[in-house]
From Swiss-Prot:
<keyword id="KW-0693">Viral RNA replication</keyword>
<keyword id="KW-1159">RNA suppression of termination</keyword>
<dbReference type="Pfam" id="PF00998">
    <property type="entry name" value="RdRP_3"/>
</dbReference>
<dbReference type="GO" id="GO:0000166">
    <property type="term" value="F:nucleotide binding"/>
</dbReference>
<keyword id="KW-0547">Nucleotide-binding</keyword>
<feature type="domain" description="RdRp catalytic">
    <location>
        <begin position="473"/>
        <end position="586"/>
    </location>
</feature>
<comment type="function">
    <text>RNA-dependent RNA polymerase that plays an essential role in the virus replication.</text>
</comment>
<keyword id="KW-0808">Transferase</keyword>
<dbReference type="InterPro" id="IPR007094">
    <property type="entry name" value="RNA-dir_pol_PSvirus"/>
</dbReference>
<dbReference type="GO" id="GO:0039694">
    <property type="term" value="P:viral RNA genome replication"/>
</dbReference>
<keyword id="KW-0696">RNA-directed RNA polymerase</keyword>
<dbReference type="GO" id="GO:0003968">
    <property type="term" value="F:RNA-directed RNA polymerase activity"/>
</dbReference>
<dbReference type="InterPro" id="IPR043502">
    <property type="entry name" value="DNA/RNA_pol_sf"/>
</dbReference>
<dbReference type="GO" id="GO:0003723">
    <property type="term" value="F:RNA binding"/>
</dbReference>
<dbReference type="InterPro" id="IPR002166">
    <property type="entry name" value="RNA_pol_HCV"/>
</dbReference>
<dbReference type="InterPro" id="IPR043128">
    <property type="entry name" value="Rev_trsase/Diguanyl_cyclase"/>
</dbReference>
<keyword id="KW-0548">Nucleotidyltransferase</keyword>
Amino acid sequence: MPLLHTLNTALAVGLLGARYYPEVQTFLGLPDYVGHMKNVVRSVFQGSGLVVVSSDTVGVRGTYSNRGQIGSSLGCILAVPDSGADIEIDLDRLVGTEEEATSCLVEAVGSTADVPRRRVRQKGRFAMHAVNAAKLHFCGVPKPTEANRLAVSKWLVQYCKERHVVDSHIRTIVNTALPRVFTPDAEDIQVVLDLHSVRAHDHRNALAEAGKVRKWWVNLAMHPMTGRSWSRAWRRLCRLPDDQAISFVRXGCLRELVGRETQISRGENPAMRVFPLANPPKVRRIFHICGMGNGLDFGVHNNSLNNLRRGLMERVFYVEDAQKQLKPAPQPIPGIFGKLSGIRRRLVRLAGNHTPVPREKYPSFYKGRRATIYQKALDSLHDRPVSRKDAELKTFVKAEKINFTAKKDPAPRVIQPRDPRYNIEVGKYLKPYEHHLYRAIDAMWGGPTVLKGYDVGELGNIMSNTWDKFRKTCAIGFDMKRFDQHVSVDALRWEHSVYNAGFNCPELAQLLTWQLTNKGVGRASDGFIKYQVDGCRMSGDVNTALGNCLLACSITKYLMKGIKCKLINNGDDCVLFFEADEVDRVRERLHHWIDFGFQCIAEEPQYELEKVEFCQMSPIFDGEGWVMVRNPRVSLSKDSYSTTQWANEKDAARWLAAIGECGLAIAGGVPVLQSYYSCLKRNFGPLAGDYKKKMQDVSFDSGFYRLSKNGMRGSKDVSQDARFSFYRGFGYTPDEQEALEEYYDNLQLLCEWDPTGYKEELSDRWILNEFPTTL
């Protein structure tokens, strides 16, 4: 038997060699079976001898076995087809279209009298298509890392599910295709051979040589009889500049860009009175470090009369309908807020009764320039008490980074603050009460709900714990279309009733009524607008954040009555977690936000935690715990822009180094982002001096900075778990992550102003902007 086994094994090797090499067929004396041998798919050794399985020769398909003796002619090995119908598929061969792979069915062959016909789906062809698609998605053969293995496996499973393959077949296909994705085929090998061919090396060397400039003395020695050589030598002796190779600045310089003017006019409202002035509009500036982002176009709106008028029309007085026509904001059903009375009583009980803090303490709630402003307002209150005029609005166009790539000409946002004197009198009640009410909302929902004041690690773990509370979790993110604009008088009255119940103070009640009807003046350098509006949330009010959270959490609690769910909230940004079989009920109930006067915009349901987006962040597992990570497709460009003025190169370096410091505090150990922020800190930290003072400036205050204040992550090694989770969340493959990190780790940035006509070149843009196949 050992000898028989050895002979059969040798025959198997010979027959497989004959499949690929005609010379082997001739050597084995098989000229009559060349057609058969070219199409032999697989040979399998069984106890009865060598079995050559599934020849694809035209007109002949089936299983062939060596029913003859070993010493007989090799021609006896290829006997007539058996009556069995064993079908094997060649996974090495490239097949036709994907439709052929998924729909092609073959019939069992053999003796049709003995074996009934049956149809077998060719999973092998489909698996080969999956291999090819995976290599295209992962840009060739992935590196053999654990993160890539998990990413490829996940991608293959989703590839099969999108094509409605049953689970039992998915497992077979994935197990078959996975190792082949990591195994280079002939084309993969040929690419490497071409890159390292003699011809390729010669061309690269020639290109490098063409870009060199010989030293002047070398040039003189090689060409002593030319005037050009002696001219160079003379210039060097006179300490004049020598010839240099040309170089192009590709990344890293500083740019100053002017503010934008809207090109859309929406007319005026009867409640507006416009007063143009002869002065030109004041042009704002936005500053940018080139070479760091993915080419998104960020800008800032000027505080001009043109922008102010459109901002008031579209963000205060009117909303757009489905036909892009302006109409008044929808009003709530009369009496609808009365249905929230039970929720109000519960929140008041949980928050408890409170008294105001002394007004002298209010400036201490702020730092820097804001503390100074409130101290001056406090001093004036000693001379004269607060009045209705102090509640009037002083409106201007907000100076913020606008993504003009996402929307070419959006309506400018306006800030509508009241006098600091009014804010002190209201704030002495509501500022300390704010956190008590947030914790009451948490208690009402049965866990952390209003996610303010947490760092990114705490936020990520809250998201993970909330996700784990359900058997099969589904999450839907939703927010309100221009929430502030849709806050009606009825909504404000219900919100104020919660505060009044907690304090039972006539002074507070009187101050809050001044928010129901609002008068204001919007000022720009080239004109001003006087206007009046009923209701609406004013963005500068002390209770803006508190009131929005209170309304969003309370209305959602009412709408989801009877459904087991959990909410996380930050103002009008909400995510609801629940059992997947409740998705239809949840989506239907979200439509009833319109009953309260709000237009709810619900996102698509998500069934993977990394796909859940909250405040433009997604939870990513870094190998130790969950952390909220900002969307790199937006943040990598947004963080390279500044609305804070860069007076000179050192001022720019301070700002950029501070961004790097803050970024590492919230993104240490996160793929791509850690290298991005390290690049800023490495390039500009040595030039900036004491850049941490820049973080204390009121102009540096932002959601990004507030997140970083509690962050203590710092630089650390990126784990394979983090790479896989980052891939699931944002679609960048582990190899793409490493390519981006290599780009940022080696990027040298210039702290110089850009040359005239400079166009930013981004060699990493194709990776950052690539939107992969849905996972």
